[in-house]
Amino acid sequence: MVNNMTDLTAQEPAWQTRDHLDDPVIGELRNRFGPDAFTVQATRTGVPVVWIKREQLLEVGDFLKKLPKPYVMLFDLHGMDERLRTHREGLPAADFSVFYHLISIDRNRDIMLKVALAENDLHVPTFTKLFPNANWYERETWDLFGITFDGHPNLRRIMMPQTWKGHPLRKDYPARATEFSPFELTKAKQDLEMEALTFKPEEWGMKRGTENEDFMFLNLGPNHPSAHGAFRIVLQLDGEEIVDCVPDIGYHHRGAEKMGERQSWHSYIPYTDRIEYLGGCVNEMPYVLAVEKLAGITVPDRVNVIRVMLSELFRINSHLLYISTFIQDVGAMTPVFFAFTDRQKIYDLVEAITGFRMHPAWFRIGGVAHDLPRGWDRLLREFLDWMPKRLASYEKAALQNTILKGRSQGVAAYGAKEALEWGTTGAGLRATGIDFDVRKARPYSGYENFDFEIPVGGGVSDCYTRVMLKVEELRQSLRILEQCLNNMPEGPFKADHPLTTPPPKERTLQHIETLITHFLQVSWGPVMPANESFQMIEATKGINSYYLTSDGSTMSYRTRIRTPSYAHLQQIPAAIRGSLVSDLIVYLGSIDFVMSDVDR
């Protein structure tokens, strides 16, 4: 049952419940490195933000990793062009900065380290010596900002083509297509691009063969159906055995973070739907919550429950596609057609509520676009009566099949240590026995008031365990929806706050000031206070987060989007070496990713 629904509005926003400036880790750092070794930044992230010197980076990182309750996961790493930022009071001088977001599972706490860099000295030591998953994040930061990570094993472009000129997330780099010269693809340029895509094993430390035999290098993708999108993996093969492999991403990159600098806080909402295009409203949740932290908005009870309801509907929708396509990858065709019948019922419900199907863009800063329509409860009731029996049939007919089990049990298996090293989240992490779901560990949007369980594996994450956890997660989402149906609070669907966007239109009819405010917020967008905010959520494929920097304008100064699929694809070589090509196909199906979530 849902508890204390009417008490939600009396609670402080989650980022205010614990003062991150007094986090115990700050004292531990001061005791070890001295009180003047770093600068603590006050933000609305809810996370301790500590500026340290470049020379201290590896030492501080190693210290945090070896604490009694250690920071065991590098959750995110990226940069920012600080040159045009006007509100930097009390911060170290910087033209650029690099941030490192670490998570401690034991503490259920985070810390963010920042390093200030001058434009004429954009160098920082690589973090890969402490966290192997820093590899791709450092490549992306160099690709998009031009910051060099000394000692990196292979610092090369990852999002942009190898022939690309410039670093797109710099403030002096054009943000609109109209600012570029017209694009022309000549024969010479086409040949150059094709040559750049030619795989050269030596660049990756690979040998072309041994004394007795040559290795085969095979492209899987970027248009192979089992790659689940525009994704290439170059395989180094000894017969059918995978000696090593190199994932190649970026074909779906659209510059989503750059777009955040040219859209208003309100008009960026539709772009969030397309980060992970199966997640719908789930994608909107972290962005809208992060903006509401900046604005200091607390939404009504009804908004919280509506948001949870839409998020869980899209979670079920995504999980159904994942489970059925996994079964299809292993070789059974029928379940995917049944799943699309079930997903259609969800789309009918979502369309009735929001007016759209896949990409509703329905959450708003301070609420939702409009109230629930008449009859929504009947449609939800019909779906809740329908789905449990269908789910049982999937399990019985396909997931308990001995051939499927034989193809997936023990394949691409890893433990908790490996999952944490590679930044794995979601079912892949929980399959290793680590009980970490943001909805329970760090509740948002009122999840703490719902009664549901978090499925956890027995210690080893393999293909079969990952898919079976998703089946149980689907059941738990049905439990949450049942509680939304039975306990939907009355009340407004928007917060009564000056920065709620769009503001209530009824007030525009009363006097001119409200009409002017409404016009400005709808046309130019709301002006958010200068600060930084952060929100992570349990998305359909793992932990998704938005880290927003406001410089006191109508647009974000920096929008950082951390997606789970990016981290999960980086882990592929470590998990699949020594396996067969057929095992790789099953492994890819078990990850649950879409390339829009990877490439952004």
UniProtKB/Swiss-Prot annotation:
Residues 1-190 are annotated as: NADH dehydrogenase I subunit C. Keywords: Cell inner membrane, Cell membrane, Membrane, Multifunctional enzyme, NAD, Quinone, Translocase, Transport, Ubiquinone. Disulfide bonds: none annotated. It holds the Pfam family Complex1_49kDa. Transmembrane segments: none annotated. HAMAP family: NDH1_NuoC, NDH1_NuoCD_1, NDH1_NuoD. This is NADH-quinone oxidoreductase subunit C/D. It comes from Escherichia coli O139:H28 (strain E24377A / ETEC).
